[in-house]
Amino acid sequence: MEKQVQMPEVELNSDHKMPLVGFGTCIPDPIPPLEELATIFLEVIKVGYRHFDTASCYGTEEALGKAVAQAIESGLVNGREEFFITSKLWVEDADQDLILPALKKTLGNLGLDYLDLYLIHMPLRLRQGAEMFKYTKEDFLPFDIKGTWKAMEECSKLGLCKSIGVSNYSCEKLSKLLENATILPAVNQVEMNVVWKQSKLLPFCKEKNIHVSAWSPLLSYGSIWSQNAVMENTVLVDIAASKSKTVAQVALRWIYEQGASFIMRTFNKERMYQNVQIFDWELTQEELDQIQQIPQRRSNLAEAFVHPEGPIKSVEELWDGDL
């Protein structure tokens, strides 16, 4: 039997524990056929990953569910409770009356009775049937942050998701949500890496006891939308060389030392192991100071989700100026 990676966990404010490393299932087109993708995910499970991050808009829920079922049926894992499965409510379903049906559809795709974590994907709403990333002004609808969160709380009370949270929420939008929340968001999943450190959001979430989870911790290196600002950063390259680590390990260790978890995706088995070999060593204060000097810039502005005649008119408004 091949060796399995060991994953530390973080206890969320919902009293549930989440593995600090999640395997991302957002895959650029063309997405492999169902059976092929399920086989890929099953190999990831064999390596030892148990936290999987998906979303209704990724088109990967069904394949992930199939892999989870195969892992349980084959005895590779002891049962559903070994997994931590996250999915997300897409913007077209971000309405109080649409959330429960959307969650039930996600559970059906996955073949599961409950999610470990359900996130609001973005703080906005679009018309159902809108063409992905080709939105017109008619597609943008008012977003009821209070009603949407109330429906998320109901899903939690029904036992359909153990924890609920948000994704891509600024401090200001989180503050507005918290005004009426009876259940705190357990997680805010956001873009976070050494070139976008979330220096404003991270302390805010820590103060509110909301865990921050990083997507794009390496700027999606190796994908069609990748950038090299992390993996070819000279500060990280030098630190990695001095510590006999990979650049990715240094970048991920930095995120871990900020108290955040992260979502990774690689189909290279060696890197699957390398990316979690970050928990038994530390960055020095000098190295942290060097990383602190790296210029900052948000990489994904989500320009497609704003419209000058819509509820959110600019990226500045979407991110509340935190660019």
Swiss-Prot record:
Disulphide bonds in the chain: none
List the molecular function annotations (GO) for this entry.
Answer: oxidoreductase activity
The pathway entry for this protein reads as: Alkaloid biosynthesis
The catalytic site is made up of: 58
NADP among keywords: yes
Check the record and name the Pfam families matching this protein.
Aldo_ket_red (PF00248)
Say yes or no: keyword NADP present.
Answer: yes
**Residues at the site labelled Lowers pKa of active site Tyr:** 88
GO terms, biological process:
indole alkaloid biosynthetic process
Q: Where does NADP(+) bind?
A: 53, 167-168, 189, 215-220, 289-297
Enumerate the Gene3D superfamilies for this protein.
NADP-dependent oxidoreductase domain
Q: How does activity depend on pH?
A: Optimum pH is 7-8.
Give the temperature dependence. Answer: Optimum temperature is 42 degrees Celsius.
EC number(s) stated in the UniProt entry for this protein: 1.1.1.440
Instruction: Provide the alphabetized UniProt keywords.
Output: Alkaloid metabolism, NADP, Oxidoreductase
**Source organism superkingdom:** Eukaryota
Show which residues constitute the signal peptide: none
As its record notes, the protein acts as a catalyst of: rhazimol + NADP(+) = rhazimal + NADPH + 2 H(+)
Protein purpose: Oxidoreductase involved in the biosynthesis of akuammilan monoterpene indole alkaloids (MIAs) natural products, components with various biological properties such as antidiabetic, antibacterial, anti-inflammatory, anticancer, and antimalarial activities. Catalyzes the conversion of rhazimal to rhazimol.
Its subunit composition reads: Monomer.
**Family named by the database record:** Belongs to the aldo/keto reductase family.
Q: What is this protein called?
A: Rhazimal reductase 2
Q: Which organism is it from?
A: Alstonia scholaris
